[in-house]
């Protein structure tokens, strides 16, 4: 009987030890964001109840960035990496801290605001008075946006610039291949941010080249 009680006590002690060990293990999931917005360049999406406009200068032209559309294989919180020409891996413990389309729009808006410094830049969705003041809208359809740690990141996207009345002013396709500086997921995400910055620069260049009489035609 005493031996039986001793065995039970040992088992209970082991169970308690495993329980404490399990409680001590932290969640291994890591969360990432794309790029890092310059202070004051783009307003937080948390203020969705108010017009989310950002004044990048003293100009009167308003640029709207969005919507951004991502393919279904990327429309998830997990980061997706390329493992072959036709294969990908969905990472369980490496996730986006925000919806991917929101992160893409944020970085693009940041680049446009920085490179078209006399314009107002707003992020989709916009409402009320802000919606009525937009002269240029950038719509982006992402075709591919993935990479491999220690290798390259590929961003392939079609994008359009629309006038405030819906007329198409430009239609382009951009493919950006960005090298990943070293192994690991954080460097890969950083490379994804740089690829988006390159796309944002292309969009800003196109906007700056648009004839300013577009505003007068509104």
Q: Which residues does each PLM region occupy?
A:
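Soluble periplasmic/extracytoplasmic beta-strand elements of cell-envelope proteins
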Residues: 62-69, 80-82, 137-141, 154-160, ...
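Intrinsically disordered, low-complexity terminal tails and inter-domain linkers enriched
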Residues: 9, 39-58
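Bacterial N-terminal signal peptides that target proteins for export
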Residues: 2-12
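Surface-exposed short loop/turn segments
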Residues: 25-48, 115-165
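C-terminal/domain-edge helix-coil "capping" segments
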Residues: 24-48, 116, 182-218
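Short secondary-structure boundary motifs at beta->alpha junctions and helix caps
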Residues: 88-97, 165-205
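C-terminal motif of bacterial Sec signal peptides marking the signal peptidase cleavage site
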Residues: 19-22
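N-terminal segment of the mature soluble domain
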Residues: 59-129
């Amino acid at each position: 009987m005493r031996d039986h009680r001793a065995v039970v006590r040992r088992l209970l002690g082991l169970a308690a030890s495993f329980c404490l060990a399990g409680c001590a293990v932290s969640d291994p999931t890591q969360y990432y964001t794309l790029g890092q917005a310059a202070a004051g360049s783009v307003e937080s999406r948390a203020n969705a109840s108010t017009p989310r406009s950002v004044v990048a200068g003293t100009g009167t032209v308003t640029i709207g960035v969005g919507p951004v559309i991502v393919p279904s294989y990327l429309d998830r919180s997990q980061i997706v990496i390329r493992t072959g020409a036709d294969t990908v891996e969905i990472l369980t413990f490496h996730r986006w801290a925000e919806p991917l389309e929101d992160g893409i729009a944020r970085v693009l808006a940041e680049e446009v605001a920085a490179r078209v410094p006399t314009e107002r830049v707003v992020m989709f969705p916009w409402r009320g008075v802000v919606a009525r003041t937009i002269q240029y809208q950038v719509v982006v359809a992402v075709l591919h946006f993935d990479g491999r740690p220690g290798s390259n990141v590929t961003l392939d996207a079609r994008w359009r610039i629309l006038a405030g009345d819906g007329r198409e002013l430009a239609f382009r396709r951009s493919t950006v291949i960005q090298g990943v500086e070293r192994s690991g997921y954080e460097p890969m995400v950083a490379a994804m941010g740089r690829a988006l910055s390159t796309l944002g620069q292309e969009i800003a260049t196109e906007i700056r080249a648009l004839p300013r009489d577009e505003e007068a035609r509104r």
